[in-house]
C-alpha cells in the first residue's frame, strides 16, 4: 500500500535521479516502425488509427494548418498511450503532473497564437474586440479577451490533470475499501469490487476521451489562427 493517498503521484526516482524522462519516452516503444511489420496487424491498426485522427482533426484546417498534422497525430497518440499505461498497477502517470501538461499546452498554444499573428494579424487582433461593441465597453472587453486568451493553455493543462488524477484517486479509494471489507463483510467487498471493475472500464474510456479533448482543443486553437 502507498504511504498516503497522493504517494502514487510523486515522481519516481532511481538512485536519487528522477526517471520521468524514461517513463515519458516509454510509449514510443509501443509503436514500432520496422519494415518487417508492413503487413502486420498492429501496423494496419496504426495506419487506420492515424487516418481516423487526421479525418477527425485536420479536415477543417487550411493547407497551412495541415502542416501541423504530424504534431497533432503524435500528440493524441502520446497522451492516449500514456494515460492507458498509467492505469496499470504500480505505474506512474506523467499526465497527472500539472508541470508535464503545461509543458505540452503552453508551446502548442503559443505556436498557434504566433502563427496567427504572423499570417493573420488583423483577424487575430479582431478577436479581442467583437463587432458592434459599444465604445464604453471596448477597454473592458479587450482586457477580458486578453485574459481569456492567456488562460487557454492553463485550462488545457488543468483539465487533463484534474480528470486523470480524480479517476486514479477514486480507484485508489475504492480499491482500499475493497481490501478492508474483505475481512469485515465479504458481500459488501464483492459489491465494491464490481464497482471497481466498472470504474476501471470507465477510466479506460476517460483516458482516451481526455487525449481526444486535449488534442481537439489544440486543433481548434490552431484553426482559429490559420
Swiss-Prot record:
One of its GO terms (biological process) is response to hyperoxia. It is a multi-pass membrane protein. The keyword Cytoplasm does not apply. It is found in: Mitochondrion inner membrane. One of its GO terms (molecular function) is proton-transporting ATP synthase activity, rotational mechanism. Coiled coil: none annotated. GO terms for cellular component: mitochondrial inner membrane; mitochondrion; proton-transporting ATP synthase complex. Pfam families: ATP-synt_A. The keyword Ion transport applies. Keywords: ATP synthesis, CF(0), Hydrogen ion transport, Ion transport, Membrane, Mitochondrion, Mitochondrion inner membrane, Transmembrane, Transmembrane helix, Transport. It catalyses: H(+)(in) = H(+)(out). Its main location: mitochondrion. CDD domains: ATP-synt_Fo_a_6. Subunit a, of the mitochondrial membrane ATP synthase complex (F(1)F(0) ATP synthase or Complex V) that produces ATP from ADP in the presence of a proton gradient across the membrane which is generated by electron transport complexes of the respiratory chain. ATP synthase complex consist of a soluble F(1) head domain - the catalytic core - and a membrane F(1) domain - the membrane proton channel. These two domains are linked by a central stalk rotating inside the F(1) region and a stationary peripheral stalk. This is ATP synthase F(0) complex subunit a.
